[in-house]
């Protein structure tokens, strides 16, 4: 069975992963068939680059992505695009849907960042309140 999975590269405490197509029996950093992308988890935000045409080719030939790679592919919108193609949508409809999807993802990202900053400020206020309340 052929898998699309991560292969670790980089150095100690600074991982960079290659998204590779490999036989399921080969070790994590062992032999592989093709490099189809990269993933940098330490970048802010996480950097994912993929070769969409090669991933589509390998998935059509039966390669199974691992759970982690599947979630990375999903964040790029490739699985949604493939689903639209399988539903028989035209290229114009697919591009319009993908634009809507990207806008929706940008809005979700902004909401998450706003919530994160709100939580940080609330935590700082609570700490300041506890510090002043403890001295009095």
Swiss-Prot record:
SUPFAM superfamilies recorded: Ribosomal protein S16
Cited Gene3D superfamilies: 3.30.1320.10
GO biological process terms, semicolon-separated: translation
UniProt GO cellular component terms: cytoplasm; small ribosomal subunit
Superkingdom assignment: Bacteria
Keyword Ribosomal protein: yes
Keywords: Ribonucleoprotein, Ribosomal protein
Basic residues bias locations: 113-122
Keyword Metal-binding among UniProt keywords: no
An annotated Gene Ontology molecular function: structural constituent of ribosome
Ranges for region Disordered: 113-136
Alphabetical list of NCBIfam families matching this protein: S16
Family: Belongs to the bacterial ribosomal protein bS16 family.
The protein's name: Small ribosomal subunit protein bS16
């Amino acid at each position: 069975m052929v898998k699309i999975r991560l292969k670790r590269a980089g150095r100690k405490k600074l991982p960079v992963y290659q998204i590779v197509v490999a036989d399921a029996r080969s070790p994590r950093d062992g032999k592989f068939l093709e490099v189809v992308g990269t993933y940098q988890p330490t970048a802010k935000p996480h950097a994912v680059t993929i070769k969409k045409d090669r991933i589509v080719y390998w998935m059509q030939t039966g390669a199974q992505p691992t759970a982690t790679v599947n979630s990375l592919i999903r964040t790029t919108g490739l699985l949604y695009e493939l689903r639209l193609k399988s539903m028989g949508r035209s290229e114009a409809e697919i591009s319009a849907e993908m634009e809507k999807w990207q806008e929706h993802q940008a809005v979700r990202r902004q909401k998450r960042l706003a919530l994160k900053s709100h939580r940080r400020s609330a935590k700082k206020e609570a700490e300041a309140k506890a510090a002043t309340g403890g001295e009095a």
